Amino acid sequence: MDIIAQITSEFHLQAWQVENVVKLIDEGNTIPFIARYRKEAHGTLDDQMLREIAERLEYLRNLDKRREEVRASIEGQEKLTEEISAALSNAATLAEIEDIYRPFKPKRRTRASIAREKGLEPLAQVLYEQRPDCEEPLALALDFLNPEKGVETAEDALKGALDIIAENLSDDATIRRRLRNLFTVCGVVRSKSAKEEDSVYAPYYDFSAPVEKIAGYQVLAIDRGEREGFLKVSVTLDRPRAIKVISSVALKSTESPCTRAVLEAGEDAYDRLIEPSIEREIRSALTQRAATAAIKVFSTNLRQLLLQPPVKGKVALGLDPGYRTGCKVAVVDATGRVLDTGVIYITHSEAQKEQAKSTLRRMIETHGVGIIAIGNGTASKETEIFTAELIKAIGRNISYMVVSEAGASVYSASKLAAEEFPQFDVSLRSAVSIARRLQDPLAELVKIDPKAIGVGQYQHDMPKKELDNALGGVVEDCVNAVGVDLNTASPSLLARVSGINGTVAKNIVAYREENGAYPSRAAIKKVPKLGAKAFEQCAGFLRVPESKNVLDNTGVHPESYEAAKALLALCGYSLADVSSGAIGALRERVEGLGGVEEAAKRLEAGVPTLRDIVKELLLPP
């Protein structure tokens, strides 16, 4: 298979784009790096498109690998013909390859294999030929009696031969392909109750929907209901229609005495072998389709959650509401450092409620709280009313927001939280997390397993590897889109930066704690286990506000520093002007040079890269 041509066609791209993307991936470049700093190579494809290409590339390479494994296996059996080889070369899916391989695949003992051991394959071949002049099947079977092998009667011989024919028909790639397509187009998914009791699955106790039209959430609900023992599920197809497909392949003559027996073998093949097998395939395909769609929804939800605008420069108070155990409180400064913690009771007695007001008011006034984050879990509404009344009584400009507390309890009980806050109780760590996720959602949420953030239904039913890869990719893309402050970022945040793994992230923080703040991007080259390739991949996504080189605090990659300085000089500016914010007319001056395209020619730089440099230089410091 020409993988480049296949991807080019599927994604409606040009061959050079796909060739370059594949080359960049094979060279070990990360998707964020390719998307951001190799735009000339691929024509400015975004990170989501690049991830889809990478996933398809992996699938097609695995497909080719399996194709050659099957080819080698059949060749090793000395059964590879030009026709089979061509069919393998033309197979576009794993299912097609497995259909071709099915007759040659080593099998466990079956009724057909036992019949072959009894020497009944020649009888099966004679019957299947359906010659008009052949004898009646039972008469033919008399020549294959063998009491020593358990073939006592003509009926025994005929039954064994028909078992062989049934298995051969069930292994026929053409029959399986046609029936699979028929199930997909005309099949019906049905579910019935397995227990006489009410449950959340009641809507599916007498449910049916076409395979083509059943919704993903319905598939996932039915799957879960079946796993939990509430539902019996099947995929059905009009049987006469299915038998007709088999007959169209099996029927060789309408005048042969053997035809009726062969057609009966075809019906047995469908009922006993083909229908259960294809039903499993269809259900697996439906589940995969539903999971893929659900993962896309989860990814979109997670992206929106991570990219919520942060509330910068304010002391925040986090409230983790609760009834019996009270409402946990934490105050953090503008950098997220914990200033105060406590527990208040606002849903108990009036005396405790008044005490809670007094405690919270003291915290707000002592630390100059500017914003309050309220978790949206149990007792959230009561806590919101209580907070609104308190703010009104204080009479100062304090705002509050209700934030998702999904994953806060998971984080608070994690090893990471214990390392970060060994002095705090688990419940108080949740309040800290709630306050911080208002200040900087991305930096706080990367500490939590994306699956625990609560981004969609049925997420725990998804294929773990696929869900982890998809959500991990979203987190990585979001972190790299925003950029990370090298001198304040936690190991959790740094580990999501392009080119940096968990070990290197810890090394970066350890080096920072031992040697002080990094003075520049280049300084991380001294970090253990961070080599030249890792630096290339991560440098552009790291920010160093303290650096003497203002470009270290932008999204301009170090490899483009000379181009950035040359552009500034061409427009009558310097790096000092960038630092002071005195380059407001940069875009107009670039246009005065004939636009980005003309400037790129003069500087021998790529147009997309130069366009990004202009955009980065104009961002506020």
What are these regions (language model features)?
Residues 30-31, 42, 46-148, 340, ...:
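Accessory alpha-helical DNA-binding modules that contact the DNA backbone or grooves
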Residues 1-19, 26:
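Generic start-of-chain signal for non-secretory N-termini
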Residues 180-188, 319-323, 377-381, 403-410, ...:
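A glycine-rich phosphate-binding loop feature that marks nucleotide/adenosyl-phosphate handling sites
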Residues 49-52, 59, 63-318, 322-423, ...:
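Duplex nucleic acid-engaging cores and interfaces of nucleic-acid transaction enzymes
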Residues 96, 225, 401, 407, ...:
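Long, charge-rich intrinsically disordered scaffolds of nucleic-acid metabolism proteins
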Residues 18, 341-348, 371, 413-426, ...:
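Short beta-alpha connecting loops at secondary-structure transitions
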Residues 281-299, 452-485, 583-621:
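Long, charged amphipathic helices and adjacent flexible linkers at domain junctions
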